[in-house]
């Protein structure tokens, strides 16, 4: 476990807020589970997210070890990051994150779990840590309209296929988006960002072959 009591959650979130400001990372959604956490974030530069997480770890791990008289690392390996196609998946990821406590049977209603951004998006508690994404603002013209629309989206839940897709992408670090999105991203970062295509490569169409000049 990485969070054992309320103070652990509060201290972690305070350091996360400090680090997000320092390294210019916009936090759109989060959940702190007993043994892991999820963040939906937009860093201002390519190193912002990793620097933020390193800074938080350098502060939180010593605090946790002192408090519970333990030594060693707290996390199992480096954090995993997934690039997403915002237009297609951002709001789905937001709901996936905030419904995590429900899927884990910690609560029945996400509103009953205090350590996530759901209360902010649902309009029951403003959270200064959260930077509302433009796609959240697009849910309505007023805060009231946005909150009602978001609560309805969460009430609808996610399909089993959506949960599986997001879970696999998170655990494996694959980009989350269409094949065109992944292809464009691979050209930018010069590495594979999704699972390898199965099967043999297709044979060239004979009608497209050219005679050597």
Regions found by a protein language model. Give the residues of each.
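Short Pro-Cys-Gly-centered "Cys-loop" motif that presents a nucleophilic cysteine in a tight turn
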Residues: 1-29, 33, 43-213
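Amphipathic alpha-helical hairpins
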Residues: 38-39
């Amino acid at each position: 476990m990485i969070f054992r009591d309320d103070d652990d959650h509060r201290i972690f979130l305070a350091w996360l807020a400090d680090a997000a400001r320092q390294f210019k990372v916009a936090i759109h959604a989060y959940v702190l589970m007993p043994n892991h956490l999820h963040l939906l974030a937009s860093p201002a530069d390519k190193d912002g997210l990793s620097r933020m997480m390193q800074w938080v770890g350098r502060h939180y791990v010593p605090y946790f070890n002192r408090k519970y008289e333990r030594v060693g690392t707290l996390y199992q390996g480096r954090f995993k990051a997934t690039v997403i196609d915002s237009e297609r998946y951002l709001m789905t990821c937001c709901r996936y994150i905030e419904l995590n406590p429900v899927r884990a049977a910690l609560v029945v209603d996400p509103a009953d779990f205090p350590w996530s951004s759901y209360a902010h998006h649902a309009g029951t508690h403003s959270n200064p840590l959260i930077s509302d994404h433009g796609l959240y603002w697009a849910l309505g013209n007023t805060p009231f309209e946005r909150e009602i629309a978001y609560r309805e989206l969460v009430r609808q839940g996610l399909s089993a296929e959506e949960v599986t897709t997001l879970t696999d992408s998170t655990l494996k670090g694959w980009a989350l988006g269409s094949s065109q999105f992944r292809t464009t991203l691979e050209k930018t970062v010069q590495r594979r960002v999704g699972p390898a295509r199965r099967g043999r490569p297709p044979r060239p169409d004979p009608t497209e072959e050219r005679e050597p000049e």
